């Protein structure tokens, strides 16, 4: 059934509302001072002049602009930048903690190498660079060198990919996210450039799966758009509807929440397409008739059976979409990764039927600036690479392992589905190097660890994060000199490339960013002053529905297990490359983790059916793995579904993350989406039993 905000609050009552609103710190720690947030390494009582420096957060995946408060030249606080288009004065919980993380004792302070006994020892930069040079000399030709980047949208990816390609390899990969399946869907349907979602100008936003107000795309900008359309004491100027398995932050904020089973986003979207076409929606696309035939098989009754949505609610939603002047449909993963191209294709098809392509308030085709590193990959080529399938092939022996691997600000051992299996991949690589600011799970498996200056200590950039409704290019400028013996990776790699005889085509990292600014038509000096470049330009969008691809890509079989698994991502709990910032421990809710034990969420009906009660210790298991957790009864979860938060279960990093809860990625295994060949892992199921 559909559940609006007022109805839900009446249903759950004040007690549950209090739980949702009250953050409680973890219990059971031996040293209570750890949780006081009065740590000795945090700057305080600094006397001196105040100043505010604009820059961009490289830690937060939303690409927001921030202002850093300095006292006597020392960074002490991050606040939102009201002048930045992706911030509008807002700031994410992870960006807000970025200054604190500068001073963390867990930061990498010197290069490390693994000794013969497996322990790490500190070495000089000279020794580290010599070791790196020797290791990479042996990795030339074929696919002998691989690189994984955790930077979603920086120009450094062109440099890293150039480094790989000049060595004779094609094995450059980005960490999985929403952009890769969207790029595949967009390409299959004939799109040019990058998909953009013009949320600010829409009067009806339907998010299917995509957690747009918390962890999907440009979440802080999305929140501002939502707030602007819902002024206090006045009628909303836009309606937000969320369809997904969990009452997450997007569902809580939205005007309506329609619970649907995990992994059924495509069927839900095609059910809406069927109703829109039945009501008269059409398209000039050459394959519209074939798409109409495909959509006709998704009647409200069939979609209700597949997704769990109420058929009448689906019909009412289709009618509301059709009446809107500027409707927008966004389809994505509930936890910002693991979805295939099929759900995105179904979402694009809905926007086509609604006449919302390349118009204000709709789906927009954004131009992508040309690459500026001649030997590097362009953005489209990067997004075609599938890290998960590549790593699985090596781990299983179906593909040859590279001789050397560079991992840049990424943590695949922790963050990939069945990520612990990535250890098997790394074990087959003779020489492994991590460029990182923290000793995370992946760095712990590497032979050499290079300490990278954090985003507030270096020059960097952000190119139109996925989800933007317009082109946005921003420059991250250093607000302080490196606090420890660290270096930005860009110039170090350029110098290393010269010693290896690689023709990277760039003289310095700053010159590379100046070229990227010029490629956007932006003024570098204004960017350096903190002014983001924006453009409302679009490129052509001569789209087709591609029902031939979509019909086959839908054929992903969910495992026949009692419960569907719904991972939940929240930025306060970190990202795929960052663990829980110490400041954010106070935002962890009581029944998300207690001491070292994590919690999962079931609704009351599902718990009663399984004979479970609040706080019961249970084992979730499937052929991929198993975890031991406790039960939290929460009515904001779909029937026969168990919701589990991301961000817990670290085995490395620092005392604030290590050993807290379980890693949901242990329960997720990739399968292959038919036709597209993409790795997908949004349709997992689990068994549940009392521990």
From Swiss-Prot:
SUPFAM superfamilies tied to this protein: ADC-like, Formate dehydrogenase/DMSO reductase, domains 1-3
Q: Which keywords, in A-to-Z order, does the entry hold? A: 4Fe-4S, Electron transport, Iron, Iron-sulfur, Metal-binding, Molybdenum, Oxidoreductase, Periplasm, Signal, Sulfate respiration, Transport
* Biological process per Gene Ontology, one example term: anaerobic respiration
The question of whether Transferase is a record keyword is answered with no
Cofactor note, please?
Answer: There is no molybdenum or tungsten pterin cofactor present in the Qrc complex, despite the similarity of QrcB to molybdopterin-containing oxidoreductases.
Question: Annotated Gene Ontology MF terms?
Answer: 4 iron, 4 sulfur cluster binding; metal ion binding; molybdopterin cofactor binding; oxidoreductase activity
Assigned GO CC terms: periplasmic space
The post-translation modification note in this UniProt entry reads:
Predicted to be exported by the Tat system. The position of the signal peptide cleavage has not been experimentally proven.
Q: Which SMART domains does the entry link to?
A: Molybdop_Fe4S4
Q: Where in the cell is it found?
A: Periplasm
The residue ranges of the 4Fe-4S Mo/W bis-MGD-type domain are 50-106
Under the heading NCBIfam families, the entry gives: mnquin_red_QrcB
The UniProt function text for this chain reads: Component of the respiratory Qrc complex, that catalyzes the reduction of the menaquinone pool using electrons transferred from the reduced periplasmic cytochrome c3, and which is probably involved in sulfate respiration. Is likely essential for growth on H(2) or formate since the periplasmic hydrogenases and/or formate dehydrogenases act as primary electron donors for the Qrc complex. The function of the QrcB subunit is unknown; in the absence of a catalytic site, it may provide a structural scaffold for the other subunits.
Subunit structure, as described in the record: The Qrc complex is composed of four subunits: QrcA, QrcB, QrcC and QrcD. Can form a supercomplex with the [NiFe] hydrogenase HynA1 and the tetraheme Type I cytochrome c3 TpIc(3), its physiological electron donors.
Family from the record: Belongs to the prokaryotic molybdopterin-containing oxidoreductase family.
PANTHER family hit by this protein: TETRATHIONATE REDUCTASE SUBUNIT A (PTHR43742:SF9), TRIMETHYLAMINE-N-OXIDE REDUCTASE (PTHR43742)
Q: Would you tell me the protein name for this molecule?
A: Menaquinone reductase, molybdopterin-binding-like subunit
Species assigned in the record: Nitratidesulfovibrio vulgaris (strain ATCC 29579 / DSM 644 / CCUG 34227 / NCIMB 8303 / VKM B-1760 / Hildenborough)
């Amino acid at each position: 059934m559909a559940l609006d905000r007022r109805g839900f609050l009446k249903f759950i009552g004040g007690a549950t509302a209090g739980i949702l609103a009250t953050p409680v710190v973890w219990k059971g720690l031996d040293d209570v001072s750890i949780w006081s947030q009065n740590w000795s390494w945090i700057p305080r009582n600094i006397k001196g002049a105040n100043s505010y420096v604009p820059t961009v957060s490289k830690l937060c995946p939303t690409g927001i602009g921030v202002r850093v408060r300095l006292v006597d030249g020392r960074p002490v606080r991050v606040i939102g930048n009201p002048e930045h288009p992706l911030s509008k004065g807002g700031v994410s919980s992870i960006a807000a903690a970025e200054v604190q993380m500068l001073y963390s004792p867990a930061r990498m302070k010197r290069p490390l190498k693994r000794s013969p006994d497996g322990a790490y020892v500190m070495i000089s930069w000279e020794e580290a660079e010599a070791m790196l040079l020797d290791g990479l000399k042996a990795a030339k030709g074929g696919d002998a060198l691989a690189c994984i980047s955790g930077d979603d949208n920086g120009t450094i990816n062109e440099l890293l990919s150039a480094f790989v390609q000049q060595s004779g390899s094609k094995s450059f990969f980005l960490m999985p996210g929403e952009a890769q399946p969207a790029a595949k869907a967009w390409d299959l349907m004939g799109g040019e450039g990058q998909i953009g979602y013009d949320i600010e100008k829409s009067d009806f936003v339907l998010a299917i799966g995509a957690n747009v107000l918390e962890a999907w795309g440009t979440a802080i900008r999305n929140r501002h758009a939502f707030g602007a359309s819902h002024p206090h004491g006045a009628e909303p100027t836009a309606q937000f509807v969320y369809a997904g398995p969990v009452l997450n932050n997007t569902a809580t904020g939205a005007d309506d929440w329609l619970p649907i089973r995990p992994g059924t986003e495509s069927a839900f979207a095609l059910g809406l397409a069927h109703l829109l076409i039945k009501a008269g929606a059409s398209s000039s696309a050459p394959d519209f008739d074939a798409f109409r035939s495909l959509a006709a098989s998704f009647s409200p009754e069939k979609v209700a059976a597949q997704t769990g949505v109420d058929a009448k609610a689906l019909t009412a939603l289709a009618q509301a979409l059709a009446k809107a002047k500027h409707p927008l449909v966004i389809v994505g993963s509930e936890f910002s990764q693991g979805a295939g191209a099929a759900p995105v294709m179904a979402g694009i098809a809905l926007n086509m039927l609604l006449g919302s392509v390349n118009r204000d308030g709709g789906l927009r085709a954004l131009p992508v600036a040309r690459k500026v590193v001649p030997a590097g990959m362009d953005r489209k080529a990067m997004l075609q690479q599938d890290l998960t399938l590549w790593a699985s092939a090596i781990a299983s022996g179906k593909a040859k392992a590279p001789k050397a691997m560079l991992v840049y600000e990424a943590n695949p051992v922790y963050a990939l589905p069945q990520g612990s299996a990535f250890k098997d991949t790394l074990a087959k690589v003779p020489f492994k190097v991590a460029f990182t600011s923290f000793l995370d799970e992946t760095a712990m498996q590497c032979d050499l660890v290079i300490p990278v200056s954090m985003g507030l200590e270096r020059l960097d950039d952000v190119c139109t994060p996925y989800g933007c409704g317009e082109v946005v290019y921003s420059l991250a400028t250093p607000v302080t000199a490196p606090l420890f013996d660290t270096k930005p990776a860009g110039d170090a790699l350029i110098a290393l490339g010269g010693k290896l005889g690689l023709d990277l085509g760039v003289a310095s990292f700053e010159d590379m960013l100046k070229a990227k600014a010029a490629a956007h038509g932006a003024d570098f000096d204004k960017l350096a002053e903190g002014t983001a470049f924006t453009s409302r330009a679009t490129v052509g969008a001569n789209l087709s529905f591609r029902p031939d691809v979509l019909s086959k890509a839908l054929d992903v079989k969910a495992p026949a297990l009692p419960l569907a698994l719904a991972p939940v991502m929240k930025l306060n709990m970190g990202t795929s490359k960052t663990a829980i910032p110490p400041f954010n421990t106070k935002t962890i809710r009581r029944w998300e983790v207690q001491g070292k034990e994590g919690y999962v969420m079931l609704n009351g009906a599902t718990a009663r059916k399984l004979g479970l009660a609040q706080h019961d210790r249970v084992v979730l298991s499937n052929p991929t793995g198993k975890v031991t957790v406790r039960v939290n009864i929460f009515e904001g979860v779909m029937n026969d579904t168990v919701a589990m938060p991301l961000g817990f279960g670290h085995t490395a990093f620092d005392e604030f993350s290590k050993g807290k809860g379980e890693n949901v990625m242990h329960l997720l295994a990739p399968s292959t989406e038919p036709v597209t060949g993409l790795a997908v892992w949004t349709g997992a199921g689990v068994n549940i039993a009392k521990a």
